């Protein structure tokens, strides 16, 4: 009887050890997958920074600001709306890249047309994907009990759809107030307004001239690439953040 008890105890100890080992391996495997995913998106971000000449120090600050949006958790409806908005931005990014690529391929021997397309592309990236990224972040801040005040309408904004209706300048001011300077400082508002209000003239040789001052406007492509790069980087971080929050929600639901 003593021998049997000793044998059963040994079997139990071995089973316990194997269970702990399997549990540890599973935990380590899960951790490895998470680290791989995080390293993958950071690697993508570093590649974009090198390609478009963006400081990775700025990107780390932007990443920290975006990840901080989940400090108090993210509600299910916020997660769903943000996920849909991110998909819209990704689609918009593809449209913008198609037009941006056209300026390099089809009209490179036509300087005036190329400059016109560059101006259109800049307006598209600011009013399209950049504005949408700003809106997603503004909404997530709003869901963390930070109020957006529209001084033009003299009212507080409470719904995601209402954010679309207010001026980009209001949303930029809101993000700037909450530390998103890397993003807010990337856009040239004067250039955007000059393009929208037709204050620029494009010469046959491709030079872009300010109609009022007569000065030449330069580096539009570089400014546009900088914004596009930060938008792409923001999307990578937002996707990672939303994925992590979705996993936490599923784990919480499974326990209840």
Language-model segments: which ranges?
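Amphipathic, Lys/Arg-enriched alpha-helical patches that create a basic surface
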Residues: 207-256
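Intrinsically disordered or highly flexible coil/loop and linker segments, enriched in small
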Residues: 146, 197, 201-205, 233, ...
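Flexible secondary-structure boundary motifs
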Residues: 119-185, 199
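Histidine-centered, metal-coordinating catalytic motifs and their short helical/loop contexts
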Residues: 180-208
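Generic structural signal for well-ordered, non-transmembrane alpha-helical segments
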Residues: 53, 87, 124, 128-131, ...
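Short, charged/polar, low-complexity loop and linker segments
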Residues: 106-110, 167-177, 212-214
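Extended intrinsically disordered or low-complexity regions, especially N/C-terminal cytosolic tails and loops
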Residues: 1-120, 186-187, 256
């Amino acid at each position: 009887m003593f021998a049997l008890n000793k044998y059963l105890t040994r079997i139990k100890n071995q089973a316990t050890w194997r269970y702990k080992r399997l549990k540890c391996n599973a935990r380590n495997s899960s951790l490895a997958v998470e680290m791989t995913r995080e390293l993958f998106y950071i690697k993508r971000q570093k590649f974009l920074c090198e390609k478009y000449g963006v400081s990775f120090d700025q990107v780390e600050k932007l990443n920290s600001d975006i990840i901080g949006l989940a400090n108090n958790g993210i509600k299910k409806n916020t997660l769903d709306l943000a996920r849909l908005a991110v998909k819209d931005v990704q689609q918009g990014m593809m449209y913008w890249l198609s037009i941006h690529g056209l300026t390099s391929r089809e009209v490179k021997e036509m300087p005036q047309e190329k400059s016109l397309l560059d101006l259109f592309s800049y307006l598209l990236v600011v009013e399209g994907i950049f504005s949408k990224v700003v809106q997603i972040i503004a909404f997530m801040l709003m869901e963390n009990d930070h109020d957006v005040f529209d001084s033009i309408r003299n009212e507080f904004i409470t719904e995601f759809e209402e954010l679309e209706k207010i001026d980009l300048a209001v949303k930029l001011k809101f993000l700037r107030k909450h530390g998103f300077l890397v993003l807010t400082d990337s856009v040239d508002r004067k250039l955007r307004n000059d393009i929208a209000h037709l204050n620029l003239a494009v010469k046959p040789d491709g030079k872009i001239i300010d109609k009022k001052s007569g000065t030449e406007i330069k580096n539009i492509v570089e400014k546009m690439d900088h914004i596009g790069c930060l938008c792409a980087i923001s999307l990578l971080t937002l996707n990672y953040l939303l994925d992590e929050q979705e996993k936490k929600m599923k784990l919480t639901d499974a326990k209840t």
